[in-house]
Amino acid sequence: MEAYCVKCREKREIKDPIAEYNKAGAPVTRGTCSVCGTNVYRMGRTEAHEGLPKPEVVRKAKKTQPRKGKLVIVESPAKAKTVGRFLGKGYTVRASVGHVRDLLRSKLSVDVENDFEPQYRVPNEKREVVKELKKLAGKAEEIYLATDPDREGEAIAWHLMEAADIDESRTNRVVFHEITKDAVDEAFAHPRTIDMDLVDAQQARRILDRLVGYGISPILWKKVRSRLSAGRVQSVALRLVVEREREIDDFNPEEYWSIEADLLPEGGQKSYRAKLARINGETPELPSQGGVDAVLADMRKAAYTVDSVREGKRRRNPSAPFITSTLQQDASRKLGFTARKTMSIAQQLYEGVELDGEGTQGLITYMRTDSTNISEIALNETRGFIKERYGEGFLPETPPTYKTRTQSAQEAHEAIRPTSVLRQPKAIKKYLSRDQFRLYQLIWQRFVASQMNPAVYKTLSVEVVGRSAEKNEYLLRASGSQLEFPGFLVVYEEGRDEDQTEDEEGDSAQIPVDDIRENQTQSLEELYPEQHFTQPPPRYTEASLVQVLEENGIGRPSTYAPILSTIQNRGYVLREGKRLEPTETGFLVNDLVVEYFPSIVDINFTSNLEDELDQIASGDAEWVDVIREFYGPFSERLEKAEAQMPEQKAELEKVGRECPRCGHDLIIRWGRYGKFISCSNFPDCRYTEPYLETIGVTCPTCGEGEVVRRKTRKGRTFYGCSRYPDCDFTSWKQPVAEKCPNCGGVLVIANKRQLKCLDCEETFLQDEILKESEMA
């Protein structure tokens, strides 16, 4: 038998071995080194220990410190600071700083063969956090998990309990939808246990996303190129953006004309404008100027009389208070915020801002919600404020109610609103950053407006009939409205996308109503034909894409912003101004996923899966069953794609130049945002440069370089000179070769039909400029 000798520094045979038990009751063999005689020993049971009496070990009981105090765990330090101030002495408030456990990134981390059991681990950067929380929890008499009031927050609470080995019998779950003293006190007065149905719903979503992402992405790497990836919900969003782009590309504008007329009432002094609405009872179809000229000639010979004059009133109701999706949409339209920026600033307002005399106060309710409910306390405070500030005429007799858009809305949640309408935006502006103030003002105005009376418009509609010698009948219509009572509009008006138009008539003040009566003769003063072209559908903005996702049941309040961020961060979609444009990579990934994984990008399928996740959250479905039902067909699709998807790896394309650093050939590679130029000697040489895509236009500034399409670091497209930095010409819009007919300045493409001059800012129809260029 051998043992390690500390003097010889190697294993030696034990001389005169003696088997015994040490003081701790462990079997050892003692003796001396057979070479140098030094005492040695070896741990472990041997045959010689058989029959030896095992000593009785008396272990001293550890002194246990009595538990005292209450530990509260929240997600963020800012929230911890606010909540801690409300709770006061006796409470220790700590932040987990988000999730403390997650699936391993290095592998699937889902045991498909064992009921899809997830394999969680604590990330290295969170081990110290978990260690501290475990230590504090061991000393605390009571533990309160006060994470956010949604599925994600419930899951964080459960992971905290598991990772920090927190005793469930001493643990309480508390939820509040606003961080105010009253709300926090109410939550701690009514604690509950962790809702495992909500945890399972979040866990099921996480596992589904992992199965899809880690299933499809390796196939794309193998068949196409590395760095490509696909996800469950974001693939649907990408498909919407790609299909809209193809609609735009395939669109053929069609010409049509409209006709307006200036009419003067008999005996009147003021004319008004009316629009041709019917020809012989039919909607006018005027596709070309030839047909318009014939109609104009006939209309000039017609006699016109007033057929009807109708006055009325129209009410315009306020919009519902914000939910997550509508907040993101309006912040995009009115403030130019991305969905991610909106949620980040809203989080700051929710967690609390330092106010003089009040300390840190949460300014808005929880920002991830799909419910339009309002608490009775908030409702009463708001009605009192409206009555005092604006007067009784602006206050409805009964509070307005709003229908929640989604069936899955959690009715216990509230709409996004200020925690107190008495904190008017201008009064607390000095405590907020510029963006915080703008978003808080938007939320405050929308909420107050939602509890006010409708705006009332006075409407006027005049119909005039013209009868020609050719026995044709022309119906012309003039209509308008004037604001009679502003109602909620004194506070707020909903934003619109650039392509959206007001659903309003013209100004009725332009119609001389006192001079017009039925059967009165009208004199035709002038006709105004106008050429139009049908327009393609606009590209999605973040606001309009969120709206479509919500309307189709894709995603939930907590996922809209991550979906939009993901498709942009992966380089599948670029944000051009406010518009979303797919990249070459986006087209490629979408087409492959649509062909080989059609259910993943099917809107109805994804919506139904969201409904099943809602059923898990409500306890009406088992998460394992939902995943098993999904994974069976999906795994078959994976096998089919692995076998049938053709390899599309492109040959490395040489640029025709040598690397300036090492002399090897330069080649074109694909990156996140498309092509770039790299050294073929990579990774030994890491030289790169942008791939300059020329557009066939000479630089208008220097006249020597070519205008090339470039990308910013964030992937946004712009146009510059190929001679940069010697020439600093840049433009966000694509320049064209033609010059401005007015000033000779640079023309850029403003939209599908128009060009705009960067110098004089005049706009021109593309067709007209191109025709003039061809004739010249």
Spans of model-derived segments:
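Short acidic, hydrophobic short linear motifs in intrinsically disordered regions
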Residues: 306-309, 318-331, 358-366, 536-548
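Metal- or metallocofactor-binding catalytic centers and their adjacent structured scaffolds
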Residues: 283-320, 520
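Basic, low-complexity terminal or inter-domain segments flanking catalytic cores
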Residues: 2, 23-24, 39, 43-71, ...
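Intrinsically disordered, low-complexity regulatory segments
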Residues: 53-206, 215, 286-287, 293, ...
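C-terminal or mid-to-C-terminal helical accessory/interaction module adjacent to the motor/catalytic core
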Residues: 179-261, 312
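Core structural elements
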Residues: 205-215, 233, 263-265, 314-326, ...
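Conserved short loop/turn motifs at secondary-structure junctions
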Residues: 68-69, 148-149, 225-229, 311-320, ...
